[in-house]
Amino acid sequence: MLGDVLQRRLVFVTGKGGVGKTAVTLALATAAARARRRVLVVEVNPHGRVGEYLGGVTLGPEPTEVAPGLSVAAIEPTVILEEFALRILRIRALARRLLQSQTFRIVAAAAPGIDDFLTLVRIGGWEDARTGLQRRRHRFDLVLVDAPATGHSVPLLATPGSLLKMLPFGPLAGTARELALLLSDPERTAVAVVTRAEEMAVNETLELSAAIMRVGVPLLPTIVNAVAPLRFSRAELRRLLKEPPDVPASLRPLAAAGAFSAARQRAAEREIRRLGRALATTPVSLPLVATRRFTPTAIDELADAIEHAGARRRRAAGVA
């Protein structure tokens, strides 16, 4: 799974709120940095938790290195809007005057998808300076985007195509065309959807994956996060779920707790199989990290699991 990520230059990580999308993004970034890639994590959500999970790091509009090979940055709408105006007018003083114009603010607010378009232009500039708002000294092997949750990810990814339908000609159309090519290129770009082994989460993941495929952005194998450890063998599962439990009366409260855990284990396995059948791929399962709040130590633990999952997939495929 890590190998799939390392083969790309731009990966969007998305999923239903609460599935651990940000933690998985940072764990992927950590594992990639260990593999000697220069990695940038981009936070799109203004209320995101990348900085918190890294121990209180403050994110800005320009990349900041927080660990060897690992940098972080945040999308700030005012900054990317100013860069956009500067790209058009070429003179910073004129660009700032345009931004202060009430008419421009009204037009910018009314333009559908302009924020998403500028966000993608900014991200594209970190993947390839020719796509961005301005040439940058920062160069990265891999850009990981902590993308919006399910409801907003598809409109974000669909922005270049939507803009081209409205404005098929002109400088904006040229940039939108470059972005559309970037997002649809399976050798450069992909989306990783994070989910949980729960019925509602899997249902939403299947809908999201279908929508992303319709937009034309390549998908990586789905990541099933926070999978509880397998506590029981098949024989133990059958015994625990037997009614009444095949244990002495004094142990029945303990057996009831075991039966509850066994039922959850069986349900999780069923949902992972359903997900794999529906998407015709093998999902990547990541373990539940026992922590009250995510810290750099917890992120490292999840990165270890990602590396181990990659090794298991290589062994299963017969690759050294």
Question: Model segments located where?
Answer:
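Flexible beta-alpha connector loops of hexameric P-loop NTPases
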Residues: 78-82, 106-114, 163-171
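N-terminal phosphate/diphosphate-binding loop that engages ATP/GTP or pyrophosphate donors
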Residues: 29-100
